[in-house]
A protein has these predicted regions:
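Catalytic-core regions of core metabolic enzymes
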Residues: 2-141
Length: 141
């Protein structure tokens, strides 16, 4: 089924039907109450935003599984680091993505391929960075 509508600028567009409400609720629940978290861009370099985020998850003993993803690290804060999301091989509820904007679209595609339904992106360089950033932001929609 396809619905036709006008967007805010008045141009006609095609919208897909809304997803099943129960799937939306599951996605939100996974974001707010994750059993497992992957941190894309994890690092142990002091002062780095991803390091502080990761350090807090470890320090305050997040009860679920923690999976750091960084293609150039073997271990981060005592946990095995994975080069790619797909290498984890376990179900993950939430991805926290702390990487440069140009890598975010590919990372979100990896999340989708791995069955991760919720993600939080902490990055800069999208619409606020000009034309190239606007194109990146459009790619995420």
């Amino acid at each position: 089924m396809e619905a036709h509508a006008s967007n805010a600028s008045g141009s006609a567009g095609k919208w897909s039907p809304a997803p099943d409400a129960s799937e939306i609720v599951k996605s939100i629940h996974a974001m707010l109450h994750p059993r497992n978290i992957v941190l894309v861009g994890a690092t142990d370099k002091p002062g780095n935003y991803a390091e502080r985020f990761w350090n807090n998850l470890v320090k305050y003993k997040f009860a679920g599984g923690l999976y750091p993803v960084n293609p150039s690290a073997g271990e981060i804060l005592g946990l095995k680091a994975y080069p790619k999301i797909g290498d984890i091989g376990r179900p993950v509820d939430l991805a926290i993505i702390v990487i440069p904007a140009k890598f975010v679209p590919a990372s979100l595609r990896e999340c989708a391929a791995a069955g991760i339904k919720s993600a939080v992106v902490i990055s800069a360089g999208f619409k606020e960075a000009g034309k190239d950033g606007t194109l990146l932001e459009e790619e995420l929609k």
